[in-house]
């Protein structure tokens, strides 16, 4: 796997009862409404994935309107922060995790170039930022890999800054 890959990470099972309980504990016993924005021509079955998410979220009280559009329109909205929640994808042309992690779980910091183009979320956590700084400052692959795994453990697994749902393989 890629540097920082953690084979021990497995998807959480869908558990509507627990999700409804957690929503109530968070102050949303009757759920809430949002719009899921996404492209309809960028990823395999992207519009269908958005519809499936809306149907699953409805089971826990999240009333979801789906707004899919051509990717040229969708991606133009992101820098203006016009999307409520987005179906989007990330990859790395270098095989390194830094670019993806900077855009998914780093605090937007223009002077560092972090999160200045497209943000996957409004997530901000000093702990993931410090780990990312450490990973970017070393050439020790073991140290970088450990930092990447910890960043994903905090920002993705624990805090759900992003929710990975689909891995597209291109050939």
Language-model segment annotations:
Residues 1-55, 59, 122-131, 139, ...:
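Append "and occasionally in soluble cytosolic enzymes with long acidic Gly/Pro-rich linkers
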Residues 84-89, 164:
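Paired acidic/hydrophobic, glycine-rich loop segments that form the ligand-binding mouth/hinge
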Residues 7, 21, 59-79, 102-171:
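Extracytoplasmic/peripheral linker and loop segments enriched in polar/acidic and small residues
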Residues 53-58, 65-67, 87-89:
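Long, His/Glu/Asp-enriched segments that create or flank divalent metal/ion-associated functional microenvironments
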Residues 2, 40-44, 71-73, 91-95, ...:
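Solvent-exposed loop/turn segments at secondary-structure junctions
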């Amino acid at each position: 796997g890629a540097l920082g890959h953690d084979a021990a990470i497995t998807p959480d099972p869908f558990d509507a009862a627990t999700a409804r309980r957690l929503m109530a504990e968070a102050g949303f016993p009757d759920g809430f409404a949002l719009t899921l924005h996404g492209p309809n021509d960028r990823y395999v079955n992207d519009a269908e994935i958005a519809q499936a998410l809306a149907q699953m979220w409805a089971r826990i009280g999240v009333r979801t309107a789906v707004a899919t559009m051509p990717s040229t329109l969708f991606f133009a909205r992101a820098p203006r922060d016009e999307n409520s929640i987005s179906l989007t994808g990330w990859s790395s042309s270098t095989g390194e995790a830094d670019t993806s992690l900077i855009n998914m779980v780093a605090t937007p910091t223009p002077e560092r170039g972090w999160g200045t183009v497209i943000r996957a979320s409004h997530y901000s956590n000093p702990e993931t930022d410090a780990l990312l700084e450490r990973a970017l400052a070393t050439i020790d692959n073991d140290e970088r890999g450990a930092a990447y795994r910890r960043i994903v453990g905090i920002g993705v697994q624990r805090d759900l800054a992003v929710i990975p749902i689909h891995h597209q393989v291109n050939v």
